[in-house]
Amino acid sequence: MKKTIKFLAIASSFAFLANVANADTFIRMVSGPSGGSWYPLGAKIMQTFQSKIKGTATSNTSGGGISNVMSVDGGDAEFGFTYAHTVANGYNGKGKFKKARKNVRYFATLYPAAFQVAVPKNSKIKGFEDMKAANISPGKPKWTGTAFCESILKDYGFNFDTIKKNGGVVHMVSYKESVALMKDGQADVFMAATSVPQASFIELENSPGIRFIGLPKDRIDRIVKNNPGYIYGKIPASAYKSLDKDIPTLGIVTSAIVNKDLPNDLVYNMTK
């Protein structure tokens, strides 16, 4: 059985290399982290491009909303997922971008996403004001969810440095690692800007059990006003079994981007 599996793996590798060797065009995609919705969606899109666009080979690697804009702009990828406000900030050199990313072009608006925040079900943390000395897991650097967290903490009058000075920890890790930290009791808060529902939160609902934290309307009003591209969002009660009411939060729009140097006819075929 092991020999059969090994043979199939080798055969698949040769088949992929053959596709690349025979391809006229190679589309490299940067999507999202393992455990999130972007990675499997990106894999499916790349599979579709390769099967439907003649002479095309594709690849899909993990990434994040901010880093994906940098990768596509820098020519390390031709296609990527991000958020509408993130690509706008990147193009104009604002927010987390130290320089304008002018090689990026908007490809498509996909679907809304929400900023989701969860704590263990028996946690004493009721809101962001209780996180000043907590162990939080907001995502990796250059991820949009991490930037979301920073925007919210700023409105509450503190930041990551405050948490660290107070004895807390800011875990800059992946969804998978965040789930492990929550299960082991090493993280008090898990945050992610992603689709609803999301697999990592569903897993944590089952074990050890979680409670979602929302934002007061006045906070959402102010943060949306101060951060163009942020929108009003919610986690519907129907999304997770532990919810009995909607959770008000911030929202964003998931988008796809391409490098400006892609041929027009190729981009047109990709849209189809």
Residue ranges and their predicted role:
Residues 84-86, 93-96, 123, 158-263:
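Pocket-lining segment of extracytoplasmic ligand-binding domains
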Residues 88-92, 103-109:
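Short beta-strand-centered segments that line the small-molecule binding cleft or hinge
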Residues 1-9:
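Bacterial N-terminal signal peptides that target proteins for export
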Residues 24, 54, 64-67, 74, ...:
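Extracytoplasmic
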Residues 37-44, 48-72, 79, 242-244:
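Extracytoplasmic small-molecule ligand-binding "clamshell" domains
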Residues 263-270:
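Short amphipathic alpha-helical coupling segments at ligand-binding clamshell hinges
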Residues 16-23:
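Sec/Tat signal peptide C-region and signal peptidase I cleavage site
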Residues 24-57, 113-184:
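Bilobed "Venus flytrap"/periplasmic-binding protein-like clamshell domains
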